Amino acid sequence: MTIIVTGAAGFIGSNIVKALNQRGITDIVAVDNLTKGEKFKNLAECEIAHYLDKHEFIRQVREHILPYQNIEAVFHQGACSDTMNHDGLYMMENNYQYTLDLLDWCQDERIPFLYASSAAVYGKGEIFREERELEKPLNVYGYSKFLFDQVLRRRMKEGLTAQVVGFRYFNVYGQHEQHKGRMASVAFHHFHQYREHGYVNLFGSNDGYGNGEQTRDFVSVEDVAKINLYFFDHPELSGIYNLGTGRSQQFNELAAAAVNACRAAEGKSELSLKELVEEELIRYIPFPDALKGKYQGFTQADITKLREAGYKEEFFDVKAGVNRYVKWMLENLA
């Protein structure tokens, strides 16, 4: 049985391939665009059966000439995830139409389809629950994800021929994101800031939040891969699910975790947030005028629906997850 993973050389896709490998599954077709050639490193430690360029893959899908038999599932992680990309034509073709064509093909062939949505569909809201009235995307990236989620809702009412699951990823961090540049996680940037400068910067106070007190639902990519495989194991489950921890943590906590993990590798003791600030290992910079009124101070996934689907595992909190991530970066990137 063959499994197809799109975006397989990317951040989340390569972690799904790795998680499948850990189960002994290697009959995997990895689909990606390696124009950014350095991404190959994410697959170098994985076992796959074949690599296929994204453009050739979607051509074969649209013409119904893919040569693979007995496809067990498609994990669709291939998309433009740059929220600052305002090219609507590209975003809608790459994120919406490509995904729609894959959905149609999977439904025709009765193949389970698990795809990446995004918490960006919620915009600047304060309640993050999988309900239409709470979804107000602020950019074309969020809109491209929102629009496809709407397609799934309509299809579910009409009746599906095979499983379809959309995951609304919150702030994901972890191994294999180094190719993302400025779009990599805050944990990634804090690690490199500290290694280069000996301190990390956080935004100062704004909009009722104190220094570094803005919060996010930070979720480890290890948990993200684990949940993708949970739904793969339960083909009776379809729908749209938030994929976060259900816990909102301050940027202060993430910065402290990153700095202390680096210090531990240097044989130094753990410091409290107060001590890290006093020693100027965490510094606060003025909140940018350009972001005032546009910056989200809080996100927290409502994971009630995920728990109702039977997922019982605990998530890494920021301290544990970032500590594991820093150890990986020290071994692989430093």
UniProtKB/Swiss-Prot annotation:
Pathway: Nucleotide-sugar biosynthesis; ADP-L-glycero-beta-D-manno-heptose biosynthesis; ADP-L-glycero-beta-D-manno-heptose from D-glycero-beta-D-manno-heptose 7-phosphate: step 4/4. Substrate binds at residues 171, 182, 189, 203-206, 216, 295. The active site is at 141 (proton acceptor), 180 (proton acceptor). It is an enzyme of class 5 (isomerase). NADP(+) binds at residues 11-12, 32-33, 39, 54, 77-81, 94, 145, 172, 180. Its cofactor is NADP(+). Pfam families: Epimerase. Binds 1 NADP(+) per subunit. Keywords: Carbohydrate metabolism, Isomerase, NADP. The keyword Isomerase applies. InterPro entries: Epimerase_deHydtase (IPR001509), Heptose_epim (IPR011912), NAD(P)-bd_dom_sf (IPR036291). Its EC number is 5.1.3.20. It catalyses: ADP-D-glycero-beta-D-manno-heptose = ADP-L-glycero-beta-D-manno-heptose. GO terms for biological process: ADP-L-glycero-beta-D-manno-heptose biosynthetic process; carbohydrate metabolic process. One of its GO terms (molecular function) is NADP binding. Contains a large N-terminal NADP-binding domain, and a smaller C-terminal substrate-binding domain. Homopentamer. Catalyzes the interconversion between ADP-D-glycero-beta-D-manno-heptose and ADP-L-glycero-beta-D-manno-heptose via an epimerization at carbon 6 of the heptose. Belongs to the NAD(P)-dependent epimerase/dehydratase family. HldD subfamily. This is ADP-L-glycero-D-manno-heptose-6-epimerase. It comes from Neisseria gonorrhoeae (strain ATCC 700825 / FA 1090).
